[in-house]
């Protein structure tokens, strides 16, 4: 006879209710399907995390807020004014965040997950197959190399990154990948003004312009975030992105 503890059932129910409230906050369509896929993704990440380091977060509630809710904050930006299919790239995706939660919640987008770590790329491929996601490609390559390839350069409507690199460094990775009219969505902490000021010249050099900063608190939490929207207005000069050592040692300023 199967015996399931009341404590386990109560914990599982609370977890699902938390995710329900997050999905409701973001007005996610087909929420029951989305919820199931997000829970399966979380379970897979936390299981694999026991064997090799994917995330420092091991608590499920914390995962829902800091990985899922944080990722879904991008959804409202991901639409083209002409109604055409959105093509997006997640730079430095790691184990697939924010890209995979975004793809689950907005399956119509065409998405490239980019990371240079082979183990993490292998995991992302496993995750997309496990979840049955289509219209998603994992590219295991340095972001600056991606920006030099004809297939990817100036081909995306949106780029996003949750990496800890400074904004001027991230912009050199992201802006060469964007079409003119495309946007880089940089996920940052609440206090980002100094970093933004330091990146203004770099953004202009790369063909971009700061469109807006949105500050907000993640649902069901006190976690404060910013999304910096940088619009690409001009073609990026061919010399960008530079090689990794140059980008790190002498960031654009």
UniProtKB/Swiss-Prot annotation:
Compartments, as annotated in UniProt: Cytoplasm
This protein's UniProt keywords: Cytoplasm, Methyltransferase, rRNA processing, S-adenosyl-L-methionine, Transferase
Binding annotation for S-adenosyl-L-methionine: 92, 143-144, 162
Principal subcellular localization: cytoplasm
Gene Ontology CC terms, in alphabetical order: cytosol
Recorded name of the encoding gene: rsmG
InterPro entries: rRNA_ssu_MeTfrase_G, SAM-dependent_MTases_sf
Recorded family membership: Belongs to the methyltransferase superfamily. RNA methyltransferase RsmG family.
Pfam family of the protein (one): GidB
KW Metal-binding (keyword) present: no
Function: Specifically methylates the N7 position of a guanine in 16S rRNA.
The species this protein was found in: Caldicellulosiruptor saccharolyticus (strain ATCC 43494 / DSM 8903 / Tp8T 6331)
Molecular functions (GO terms): rRNA (guanine-N7-)-methyltransferase activity
Record EC number: 2.1.1.-
Stated name of the protein: Ribosomal RNA small subunit methyltransferase G
Residue ranges that the Swiss-Prot or TrEMBL entry lists as coiled coil: none
Keyword S-adenosyl-L-methionine in record: yes
């Amino acid at each position: 006879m199967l015996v399931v503890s009341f404590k386990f059932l109560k914990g599982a129910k609370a977890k699902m209710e938390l995710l329900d409230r997050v999905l409701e906050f973001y007005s996610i369509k087909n929420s029951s399907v989305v919820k199931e896929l997000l829970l399966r993704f979380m379970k897979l990440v936390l299981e694999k995390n026991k064997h090799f380091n994917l995330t420092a977060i091991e608590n499920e509630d914390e995962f829902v807020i800091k990985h899922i809710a944080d990722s879904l904050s991008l959804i409202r930006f991901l639409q083209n004014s002409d109604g055409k299919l959105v093509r997006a790239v997640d730079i430095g995706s790691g184990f697939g965040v924010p890209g995979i939660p975004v793809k689950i919640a907005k399956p119509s987008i065409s998405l490239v997950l980019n990371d240079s770590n082979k183990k993490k790329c292998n995991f992302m491929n496993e995750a997309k197959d496990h979840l049955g996601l289509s219209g998603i490609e994992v590219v295991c390559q340095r972001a600056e190399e991606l920006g030099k390839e004809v297939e990817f350069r100036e081909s995306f409507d949106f780029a996003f990154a949750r990496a800890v690199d400074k904004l001027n460094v991230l912009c050199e990775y992201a802006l060469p990948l964007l079409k003119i009219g495309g946007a880089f969505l940089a996920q940052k902490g609440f206090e980002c003004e100094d970093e933004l000021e330091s990146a203004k010249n770099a953004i202009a050099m790369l063909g971009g312009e700061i469109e807006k900063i949105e500050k907000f608190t993640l649902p069901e939490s006190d976690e404060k975030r910013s999304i910096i929207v940088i619009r690409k207005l001009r073609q990026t000069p061919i010399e960008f992105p530079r090689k990794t050592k140059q980008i790190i040692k002498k960031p654009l300023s």
